[in-house]
């Protein structure tokens, strides 16, 4: 009887409290998503959203295994070919990549279902995406980026101006709150499909 040895290698994650590891063995690769902070959001809801996308015929990583007590889930591995990497390759068909991404976003926004069972069997209801939530999301730029790259002297003035502009833009949007919002839809998370 031969045992299957697996190798875990940390891979670049996103701006969350999740850590990602590629699990390699001689059978297949998978991704381990590990989170000790905000476990509900970073494991349960993450897997539920993927399940909702799959149910609506949108390619998303399937859940292979979960161990909530040990702070991880194991999901399908789509490889390393992100749209970001492909856009930066010489000779890539950038127009086609953008068109496919926009078509995918349009398909996602047509999802009307707002409830899905998580892997613990409980219903998860998508939150309403209102003006306040949009403001908080837009402010992430200040929370994650400006304080890292702008001097403290300029930071407060810049953040006040950015907040003012965000509020102005939101006040002119006229949100209907009936669209699925995929909060991680960006070129570093979109894979070649």
For the regions a protein language model found, what residue spans apply to each?
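Residue-level signal for WD-repeat beta-propeller blades
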Residues: 14, 66-67, 193
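Glycine-rich loop motifs involved in handling phospho/adenylate chemistry
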Residues: 8-12, 126-129, 182
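An alpha-helical support segment within catalytic cores of ATP-dependent transferases
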Residues: 1, 113, 118-125, 132-133, ...
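ATP-binding pocket architecture of kinase catalytic cores
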Residues: 21-136, 150, 174
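Short secondary-structure junctions
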Residues: 1-6, 54-58
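ATP-binding glycine-rich phosphate-binding loop
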Residues: 3-24
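Active-site acidic catalytic loop and adjacent metal/ATP-binding pocket
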Residues: 18-23, 32, 108-109, 166-193
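Amphipathic coiled-coil/heptad-repeat helices and related helical stalk/stem segments
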Residues: 16, 46, 162-165
């Amino acid at each position: 009887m031969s045992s299957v040895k697996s190798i875990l290698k940390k891979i670049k994650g996103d701006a969350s409290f999740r850590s990602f590891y590629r699990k390699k063995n001689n059978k297949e690769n998978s991704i381990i998503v590990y989170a000790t902070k905000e476990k509900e959001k970073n494991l349960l809801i993450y897997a539920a959203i993927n399940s909702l996308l799959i149910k609506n015929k949108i390619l998303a990583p399937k859940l292979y295994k979960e161990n909530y007590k040990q702070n991880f889930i194991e999901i399908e591995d789509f490889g390393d070919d992100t749209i970001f990497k492909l856009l930066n390759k010489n000779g890539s068909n950038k127009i086609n990549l953008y068109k496919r991404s926009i078509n995918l976003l349009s398909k996602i926004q047509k999802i009307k279902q707002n409830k899905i069972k998580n892997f613990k069997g409980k219903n998860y209801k998508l939150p309403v995406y209102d003006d306040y939530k949009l403001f908080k999301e837009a402010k992430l730029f200040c929370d994650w980026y400006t304080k890292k790259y702008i001097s403290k002297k300029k930071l407060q003035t810049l953040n006040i101006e950015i907040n003012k502009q965000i509020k102005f833009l939101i006040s002119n949007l006229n949100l209907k709150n009936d669209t699925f919002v995929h909060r991680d839809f960006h070129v570093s998370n979109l894979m070649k499909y």
